[in-house]
Amino acid sequence: EETRKDSLHACSIEDILALLAHIPPQDYADLRLIIFRQPKRKEEILRSAWGRLIYSYEFEGNHEPAIILEAVDYTRQLKWSKHLKPDRQAELERLRADGHQIEEDKRYFTAQYDPRFVRQTQLYRTLPHEIGHYVQYLETVVRPAQPDESSDEWYRRDDAYFAIPTNEKEAFAHRYADRFCEDMKERGLIPFAPLHPTWE
């Protein structure tokens, strides 16, 4: 999607393709869409995210899974309350590890968005994290399918997947992304320089 003047995507298509080349094909199966999206201003305020997995995304009249990567408004700050639950505290530490310069006052953690560090977050964490969600969906719903099973069986597994608590799904996706990135780092494959810098 076309971005607003104050927003841009920190990852290029070339960056995404370079990383995907190292994802096992069976882990993304029929996940063929990666959408570079411009979030609405209200979404940025109320429900900001680096990206997300959409299990059924409408595209050219078809519905199929897609990963959404959100553009970032660089006139805004990353701003979190200091009253963080353990999972949010863990995410704050991940952001620090990505390079984001986190400052704090009595009430908030803040950071200026920097495309170099946004790229680190979206390319090396968000993308494999969302693929991790899809791997869990494949393992729970798709791969157990039998050729002669009824549609009721498929929907039963689908319902079971969406009944998994959010914290369990997040833990699965974090483990997948962490294993993938640790392996890539050990092999010297990441980090790599921007292949087509979007901010220059």
Predicted regions and their residues:
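Amphipathic alpha-helical segments that form well-ordered structural scaffolds
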Residues: 15-22, 130, 172-180
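Short catalytic/ligand-binding loop motif for oxyanion handling, primarily in non-cytosolic enzymes
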Residues: 76-79, 135, 143-144
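Glycine-rich, phosphate-binding/catalytic loops in enzymes
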Residues: 86, 143-145, 185
